[in-house]
Structure formats: structure tokens, C-alpha cells
Amino acid sequence: MPTTPIPFTPLHMFRRLLCVGLFLFAGIHTTLGATLPLPSTSYKYTVLDQDLSAALQEFGNNLKISVNISAEVKGRIRGRIPELSPREFLDRLTDLYDLQWYYDGVVLYVSAAKEAQTRMLVLSSVHFSAFKLALDKLDISDERYPVRPAPGNGLVLVSGPPRFMALIEQTLNGLLAVAQAQPRATDTPARESVMVLFRGSSTTVVRGGRPEVFYTSEMLPENDDGGKAELSKK
């Protein structure tokens, strides 16, 4: 029976993104993609006539690997399969039956090639270099499924099997949430306050909380009628 997919919870994603920051700060380098733990010895598997999904499930059971097989994986294995290494055996079935597989570090996901998805993602406030680096540090990147930026770093084109695509979107959403949670510095300067205080025959202009100009009725310039001009409020 297929195993249940293990989703990343927001807390899980936050912890992994925090680890990414620590890796970047410390300058630690990791390999790309989660490594599928397969032995290098030959995998002996005798098949006469068996359902493809059952053979893949038995493959995982024999190697102590959790396997999630899509319902779209169909077919039967007939005939003898040569003695191969476990990785070669998996790749051979993938090529023969038009499949894709992806290992997320916990579960090996096998799906039909026709289930592959292609999406254009909007990076918004996240720069592509930061997005790609997060995928590498979280062991999500896979050289078989490239992530390509569009000119200007605002868009990214991603193609791959369903599990890979789900982790891509979860990572981007996590980075966007972290970016939105950070305080934003405002580029708009504070408006300067100006007050005009009238007290009897004197007038004081206060700009930015500081008295700046002091007038008396004798100091105001005369208008065209020979009277004192009035100081307008600002």
C-alpha cells in the first residue's frame, strides 16, 4: 500500500529555514538533493510476471525504504531483469515504464511521467539566488529537475514530479512569510510639523517643535493700504 505523504508543517519549514540561515552564516557546504540510501552491491530480483507497483513496493521493503507509489503507475514486469545495483534497477524500471522518482529524505516517491508539472512562480520580495540557495541547503534541489529564473529575477520556471513541486512551493511560501515578518524600513521622510502661535500682538512660528521666527505687530510689513499684513497659518 502507498505510504501517506509527509507534509512540511509551517513550524517544520520555519525550523529548516532557520537552519539554512545558520549554514549560510557558518559557510557550511552541503551536497545538492537528498541522497537515496541505496547500497552499491547488486540487487538480485527475480520477476516472471508481476505488477509494476508491487515490484516497486517490494524493492522498498527489501532495502528498508519507505515508498509512495502513485495510482498512475501501471503495468506489469514480464521476463528476466539482469542483475543490477539498486539504483540501476530503479532507473531501469523508470526508463522502461516512463516513470519519475524523487526522494525527499524520508520517502521515495514514484509517479508516472505524465504527472509531471510545470509552473511559473512569482518570487515577489525573494531574490532568486536566495530561493535557489534555500532549495540547495534544504536538500530539495535535484539536477534532473532544474529551476530556471526568468530575466529580472521576478519569475522562476519549475518542472518536476508532484512531490518535488510541492516542496518547491512550500519553500517559496516559507521564504515569503519570513520576508514579510521582517520590519520594513520606510523611505518616506517624516513630515515636518509647522505651527503658528498667536499671543496678543506677538506671533511665533514653531517648525519641527522648535521656535524659529518671532513677530510682533510692529515687525509685520505694511500692506498696500498702509496697514499691517496678516501672517497666514501653514
From Swiss-Prot:
Pfam families: Secretin_N. It is a single-pass membrane protein. It is found in: Membrane. GO terms for cellular component: membrane. It comes from the Bacteria. Its main location: membrane. Keywords: Membrane, Nodulation, Plasmid, Transmembrane, Transmembrane helix. The chain crosses the membrane at residues 17-38. This is Nodulation protein NolW. It comes from Sinorhizobium fredii (strain NBRC 101917 / NGR234). The lineage of its organism: Bacteria, Pseudomonadati, Pseudomonadota, Alphaproteobacteria, Hyphomicrobiales.
